[in-house]
Amino acid sequence: MRGKFIVLEGLEGAGKTTAHQVILAQLEKAGKNVVQTREPGGTPLAEKLRHLIKHETEEAVSDKAELLMLYAARIQLVENVIKPALAEGKWVLGDRHDMSSQAYQGGGRQIDRHLLETLKETVLGNFEPDLTIYLDIDPAVGLARARGRGELDRIEQQSLDFFYRTRQRYLELTQNNEKAVIINAEQSIEQVAADIQQAVENFLKIAK
């Protein structure tokens, strides 16, 4: 039986790391064999691309070059890790997937959405997560949390307006989406964890 693909999405400071651990523990308790991934990254080549995407280099990275590197990293991960794991009946828990590009590059960078949809269809076809959990947070709150963790990477250093556009696109993508659940990430850690666990429990009941 094919495994399932669950993805966590959200802005910086939304609490994805904590949420990841909550879901991982819940899936393992349910007897699932879980493979953990992150984007960009997850394969040797994809990790090299991650470094180029997230850190300043001697050469300025254009928005479209950034986008293409993200998709190159993504297809490496999907073809070499995610699809084989699902075929073996394993469950995959991902830190970000294609929705990040739709939100960050389509919303934040304001790259043409037709181009994004064309890239998505060309690279991924109809492959998509079985469940996306989006941790929603006001960008000002999230960035304050992120700054508290230390030095910000190239993406995290974008303007507040960039993140408000990104959040708006996330909401457009997740509202009325049967395969997505929106979690209010500004609640207490305990309540966020409880809401996530409920979403996963509901999914486990219907996952076949």
UniProtKB/Swiss-Prot annotation:
Catalytic reaction equation(s): dTMP + ATP = dTDP + ADP
Give the matching CDD domains.
Answer: TMPK
Per its record, what are the GO molecular function terms?
ATP binding; dTMP kinase activity
Write down the EC number: 2.7.4.9
The SS bond pairs are none
- Role of this protein: Phosphorylation of dTMP to form dTDP in both de novo and salvage pathways of dTTP synthesis.
What is the protein's name according to its record?
Thymidylate kinase
Its gene? tmk
